[in-house]
Amino acid sequence: ARLVATEACRSARNGNIFIGRVLDEVGLDLEIVDRRTEAYLAVSGCAALADPKAYSVVIFDIGGGSTEIAWLDGQARSPMADPTKRIRSWDSLPVGVVTLAERWGGIDVTRKTFEGMVEEVSDLL
């Protein structure tokens, strides 16, 4: 099995220390994956769920600290093929539900707060 850590460990100053402690104290060998790998893992896990008749597919993986977006060719489909070969383009935004909540006031989301969140994410696209 592959055990991965994503944006929280990528962006934390002590991410590598955390990974070391998990290994020492729990015995799990976590790998901090880069943004590309995270996007490709999202595609690997979700591509089979897409409508088989779709011309194109967009997969959003909204996490706690980042959001991955992948655009797939819907026509280049083979049941046994690696779905990551269908990726036309991908991006990773350094914002997720936890980071947005932390920056914009937690669970108390007003219309103005929501509009600020939308603007922040839109500026990253």
Locate predicted features.
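A short acidic Gly-Thr/Ser loop motif
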Residues: 60-66
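Nucleotide/phosphate-binding catalytic cleft detector across ATP-hydrolyzing
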Residues: 1-59, 70-125
